[in-house]
UniProtKB/Swiss-Prot annotation:
Keywords: ATP-binding, Ligase, Nucleotide-binding, Protein biosynthesis. This is Aspartyl/glutamyl-tRNA(Asn/Gln) amidotransferase subunit B. It comes from Methanococcus maripaludis (strain C5 / ATCC BAA-1333). Belongs to the GatB/GatE family. GatB subfamily. The gene is gatB. Its EC number is 6.3.5.-.
Amino acid sequence: MSEDLSMKCGLEIHVQVDTNSKLFCQCPTNYKDVEPNTNICPVCIGHPGAKPMPPNKKAIDMAIMVAKMLGCEMVIDKDIYFQRKHYNYPDLPSGYQKTSVPIGEHGKFLGVGITEVHLEEDPGQYKPDLGTVDYNRSGTPLIEIVTDPDMKSPEEAREFLRQLLRLFRYIGNLRGEGTMRADTNISIKYNGIQGNRVEVKNVNSIRGVYKVLKYELIRQKNVLRRGGEIKLETRAFMESQMITKGMRSKETADDYRYIPDPDLQPIVLNNEWVEKVEAQMPETPMNKEKRFVEQYGIKEDDAKVLVSDLELADVFEKVVAELGNDKDGISLAVTWIRNELKRVLVYNKLEFFETNLRPEHMVELINSIKDKTISQKIGKTIIEQMVEHKGEKTPKELINEMGLTVIEDTSELEKACEEAIKNSEKAIEDYKSGNQRALNSVVGQVMKLTRGRAEPATVVEILKKKIDG
């Protein structure tokens, strides 16, 4: 019997704004590299009578920018007030979290509806296994993005988050996946039976969200298949086991006892404020991708790879400009940045900014290949060494250090070709019988003998002269 299974998923994504001070006080937002409970004050640890400052202007601007880039309608000329969201947990010393009503609503990103974008404060960090709480993080500004339940598979949700994080990198001033947390909401329909919505809280990676959704899809299907009922509940993600575990019944808005915060004046956005923020908005990844195809005449796949990393895209444009902005320069830049540099970055699990390479390094490398100072094979070795040395050595320094310039002495090349011919009797016979490809293995022998320092086209020319007479 065939199974009829479908799922709906919505996400609540929390991303930290990279500000110097917290949302409602002047405490620094650095909480990773300091002693516990040092970057705190009466406001961020909820002392009775401590009055919050007006919300951090940069955090509001970033929330506006995120909302606009997600296609939201801005809440203009209306009170945007902060509410107290009440719940009891050790990481929330005041007993409530300050969270704004929506700043932007009804957006769309990659076909997924954006319900709302709003600001809130991050709670502290509670470690139940140790029984300790660090309040350094308490009060750090968070932007929360709430999606409609439009994602139909774990794979869709994973791709949505990947593209959203790419957008965050383009926007800047957001702290990305290392601090991103997502609450996942999933419900399934199995053979006509609709299950209740289940929320899994505080999943802190794209991989985690994917694993949660895969696990919940199977778990809920098995419950319904056995005639059980899916509870409307909140569950926790047990990352070490890659499973979810029931925490409590699902809360409603009434459970949080939302009330406007009497200590904070409402924010009122106007068109002038929003337009100022819009003027600072960067080009979106999707627009950059389209522009690369149109402006540089490169393939869509190449543009997609280049644009996937903002720094890589910037390097590409700078290198193309240095190489003359012509067809040959663009082709070389694509080959050595999109293909070779990206290959080395992926292998080493690095982003471009982590390598300390500069655009001029890539220009110097490509020019060394263009003027035949080094072969393409050696170029691949040099790019690997450039990344390994974290940009401390230029391509020319590495080429000279390693003695990797192209062999220009014809007699040296002829000697290597003669040795390769001597060791490749079968390949020579096949070549003489009409198999042109057989010569490739002989060329490979020469490249090996010369440590890649021979120019392949020159090697082929010498080999043909010697074999064909």
